């Protein structure tokens, strides 16, 4: 554990950057995602690598008349065809990891289906590439899967989360969202899994020469504190432990997501232009280009909307 998601991501990416630079000095890598969060994209660029966002084509489809979907279309999904095409084009050796943001933060918090997560895992592992999750809103995504994906209606959020996490080789998390805590984060990888195998070094006899887990642990301890508390107080750790359980409560999650949908539908019915539908589970987004009919400065239009009083 660590005190925030940004620190978790920083620790992970610093070690990935160091290992890749030692093995392949000056080499430029490509790292795809369904939608890189801004700090993830920044970390990748600082590595000298290229972030690629493989958004799903569902984003381009028209909203149904009346603004209602029978089932959530999972607009946060990754385009699997583009993923495989990218890997084969640049070469698997030039794609060290694949990221998946759950829910898809850059795409207005849109959810990612279990079927899509499963396919991302299949394609990444086909080419021996580790899959890393950014799971700030993992429970929220599991709620959307339960409510909209066939075969999950009778499963609990915790059961769905267990399956979802089974498909990743490593993950980072900001625990301030679905951890219900005022601070906290996590960085984790599967013990002896694909991430560990690909980023550890081994002697000729198969024994471990350099363990990536040890490198991550040393980095965390030197910057943020021992991995048993990660710079967090006992009170914050206890709040986080309770919050992770609370996020699995269906009633709570249903109310939270329904509030967003209610507000988004209210805007839509009132004629507000640019409302993103269906709403995600943590916010309502408005497309500023549509809202202002392209008449406002692209650099200030969002700020104008957020500060103007009616």
Language model regions located:
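Conserved PLP-binding catalytic core of the aspartate aminotransferase-like
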Residues: 274-310
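Conserved PLP-enzyme active-site core in the AAT-like
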Residues: 2-274, 298-301
């Amino acid at each position: 554990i660590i005190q925030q998601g940004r620190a978790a991501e920083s620790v992970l990416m610093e070690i990935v950057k160091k290992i890749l630079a030692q093995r392949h000095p000056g080499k430029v890598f490509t790292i795809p995602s369904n939608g890189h969060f801004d700090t993830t994209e920044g970390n990748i660029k600082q590595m000298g690598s290229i972030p690629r966002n493989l958004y799903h084509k569902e984003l381009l489809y028209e909203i149904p008349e009346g603004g209602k979907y029978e089932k959530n279309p999972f607009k946060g999904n990754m385009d699997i065809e583009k993923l495989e095409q990218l890997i084969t084009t640049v070469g698997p050796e030039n794609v060290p990891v694949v990221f998946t943001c759950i829910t898809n933060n850059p795409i207005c918090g849109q959810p990612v289906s279990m079927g899509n997560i499963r396919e991302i895992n299949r394609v990444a592992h086909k080419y021996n590439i580790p899959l890393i999750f950014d799971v700030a809103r993992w429970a929220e995504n599991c709620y959307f899967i339960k409510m909209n994906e066939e075969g999950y209606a009778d499963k609990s959020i915790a059961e769905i989360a267990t399956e979802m996490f089974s498909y990743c080789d490593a993950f980072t998390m900001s625990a301030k969202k679905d951890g219900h805590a005022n601070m906290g984060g996590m960085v984790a990888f599967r013990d002896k899994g694909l991430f560990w195998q690909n980023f550890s070094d081994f002697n000729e006899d198969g024994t471990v020469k350099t363990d990536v887990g040890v490198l991550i642990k040393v980095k965390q301890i030197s910057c943020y504190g021992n991995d048993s508390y990660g710079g967090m107080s006992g009170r914050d750790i206890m709040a986080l432990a309770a919050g992770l359980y609370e996020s699995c409560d269906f009633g709570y999650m249903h109310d939270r997501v329904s509030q967003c949908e209610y507000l988004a539908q209210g805007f839509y019915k009132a004629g507000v232009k640019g409302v993103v539908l269906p709403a995600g589970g943590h916010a309502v987004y408005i497309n500023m280009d549509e809202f202002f009919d392209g008449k406002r400065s692209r650099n200030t239009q969002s700020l104008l909307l957020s500060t103007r009083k009616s």
